[in-house]
Amino acid sequence: MPYVSTADHTQLYYKDWGHGRPVVLLHGWPLSADSWDDQALALANAGYRVIAYDRRGFGRSSQPWNGYDYDTLADDLRAVLKECLVSEGTLVGFSMGGGEVARYMTKYNGAGLVQAGLIASIVPYKLKTPDNPHGSDEKLLDETLAGIQEDRPKFFAEFFEKFYGVDKAEKPVSKELLQWSLNVAMQAGLKATLACMESIFKTDFRPDLASFKVPTLIIHGTADQNVSIDASARPAALGIRNSKLIEYEGSPHGLLATDKQRVIDHLLAFLKG
């Protein structure tokens, strides 16, 4: 299996499909690059080179003790882009992966990129503060960390029902997809799972928005129960120049599965545009 070695010798598993202009896909918490497979296959079949990797601590990548802050995660992303010789690429982050996109824009000035995408992303700020009233209470972070440590399988079984909007969907995802998601989440290291959730809540990407210098597609569901659209996509669209926001009315957080064809169609249109 192909791996990239990072600055601290962490081994990152990646898949490299197809040929053409590169598209790099960053997965969400607590999944792996496999969560992008439907979109990756469609983009590769459409004539693009698709690169997706497992974040450190997740999937098939190494599980180091340190390095789950967004500065290090942006360094990991840079290592993948350099190893794969990415130029004139499109970088798309889902959920937690949106943070890596934002921090990469600031830390590396978007090197090698001509487009960006944020899908159900946490950007710009997850935590509720006086100047970010639509964010999530820190109490939710505490409850999440406690729930994971008390009974991780039970926590994630309940988490994914909300993630995919099972209780609100006219056509819920299958129980098999829920089980698969749980299986993938349990591949991640416990330290990575906890530390990344803290980074998701506590990293303020609002200063990074000005660093986006490329056309940026933003997609978000209006019924997202995990990342409020009012704390993420809408302010991100206001803060990122040359961005386009597409709202999926009534859709939950797990858009890559619940709205997979619509995401594929919008990505292809964006890439061709």
Label for each model-derived stretch:
Residues M1-V24, N45-Y48, V86-S87, R241-I246, ...:
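Alpha/beta-hydrolase fold catalytic core
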Residues P124-L127, D131-S136, G147-A210:
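Conserved alpha/beta-hydrolase catalytic His-Asp/Glu region
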Residues H27-W29, G89, G93-S95:
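Conserved alpha/beta-hydrolase "nucleophile elbow" surrounding the catalytic nucleophile
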Residues A102-K107, A111-E150:
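Flexible "cap/lid" loop of the alpha/beta hydrolase fold
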Residues T72-G89:
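Conserved acidic catalytic loop of the alpha/beta-hydrolase fold
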Residues D8-N66:
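Conserved HGGG/HGGXW glycine-rich cap/lid loop of the alpha/beta-hydrolase fold
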Residues S211-S251, D259:
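Conserved loop-alpha-helix segment in the C-terminal half of the alpha/beta-hydrolase fold
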